[in-house]
UniProtKB/Swiss-Prot annotation:
Pfam family, one: Ank_4
The protein's name in its UniProt record: Ankyrin repeat domain-containing protein 61
GO cellular-component term (any): nucleoplasm
Residue ranges of the TM segments: none
Lineage of producing organism: Eukaryota, Metazoa, Chordata, Craniata, Vertebrata
ANK repeats: 27-57, 75-104, 132-161, 167-196, 200-229, 234-273, 277-306, 310-343
UniProt cross-references to InterPro entries, sorted A to Z: Ankyrin-SOCS_Box, Ankyrin_rpt, Ankyrin_rpt-contain_sf
Key words of the record: ANK repeat, Repeat
Amino acid sequence: MGNITRKGSRDLVVDSAKSLEDGPSAALHSKLYEAIMREDCTTIEVLLRNHPVNQPITILPNSASNRLLLTQPTESIIPIHLAAKYHKAQSLLCLLRHGADPEVRDTTGLTTLNLMLLHWPVTSTTWAKPGNRTHRILTDIQNSSITCLRILCAHGAQVNTQGEISNKRSPLHLAIAYGCYPVLSILTQNGADVNAINEASMTPLHMAANMLNKEMMETLIAYGANVNCAVSSTGNTPLKLAVCTASSKAGRLLGAGVSCIRLLLTHGAKVNAQDYKGQTAIHEACFGGREAIINLLLEFEANVNILTRNGESPIYMYLQRSCNVRDTALLARLLYHTYPLRMTNNQGILPAGIMLPEFRLLRDTLIKQSQKPLSLQGICKRNIRNIYGEKYKQHLKQFLPVTIWNSVYCCYDLAYTS
C-alpha cells in the first residue's frame, strides 16, 4: 500500500486550482463569484446546490469577473471570504444562511472576521462636504461594512480568535492597527476581550496609545481596558507609550498627544510607573523636551527625583539634548522640583547635551549645586512642592501664611541657569 495522507482545506484550495480547467467547474466558479459580487442571492442559492458552500472557488485569468479580484494568474477564495473582503452584506447573509462557516480559515490562517478587518475601507468623510455625492458614497461604504460585521457577529463569529500568522492579533488588535474605529464598540459588545495581548504582549490600548488615537482609547477605556497594564517584555504602560510618541519630533510638530495623555491620567494611569529600565513617563518627556507634556505630568504629580536602573534622573535625561538645555525656563521649572540634584549616571558620566563649550558656565554651576547640599528650608520647600504638586497649591494657600506660600511657590531656582 502506498502512503495515505489526509488532505485539509489548504490542500483542497491548491487541488481545485489545478483541476479547474479540466471540468465544468470553471463556469460554475465564475458565475458564483459574479453572483456574490452583485449580491444576487437568488443565483447564489441555485449555484450552491452544485458547490459546497465552504469550498473555495477559483477564478481563471480569462474570466471577465477576474478583473476585480485577481492580480495573479489564479486565486482561490472561499465564498464567505469573498463576501467579507468586499463587504457584500446580502451575499454574506445568504451564504451564512446556507451553512457557511464564519470560522473557516484561508491558506494563511485568517478567519472571515480577520479578512474583513484587514480589508476595512478607508472612508474618512472629514474632507467631503456633507450631502454631496462623494460623502454619500463613502457613508454607504462605511455602513455596508458595519452591516457585514454585525451579520458576522450575529452568526457566531468568534471575536477573540487570533489569526495564525498575523502576529497573534485578535480582531480588536486588527481594528486598532487598520484604523477601524466603528468596529471597536461592536466587537466589545459581542464579547471581545479589551485586555487581550498580541505576540508583542501589547493590549489594544497599548496600540491605540502608541498611535495617539484618542477616539479608540476612549472607547477601550469605556469598555474596561486596563490603563496600567505593562508590556511583559519592556514594562511599558499605555501612558509611557503615549508620552514617547507625543514627545517625538513628529508629535512636537503636529502638537499631538496631550489630550491622549490627559485621558489616561484622569482614568487612573500611574504617572510614576517604571519600565524594566526604571524609566517613568517623566523621563521620556524630559528627553523629548516638550513643555506641554512635562507640565501635564507635573500637574499629575510626576516625581522628578526617580532614578533609572542606570542612575539617570529626569533632569539628566533633559540635559542629554542640547536643544533642551537652551530652554532655560523649562530647565528652571524642573530644577524647581528636584532634590537632590544628580548630574551623573551610575558610571559617573555627565549628560551629553551639556558638554558643549557654549554650556560650560551652566555645566559648572549645576555641578557645584549638585555637590552643595540645600539648606533645610530649601529642602522643605521642595518637599512641599513635590508632595502637594501643582494641583493642590491653591488649596494649600488657604492654610499657609502668604509670605511662606510665596516663598514656596513663587521663587524658581533661576540662579542655576543664570
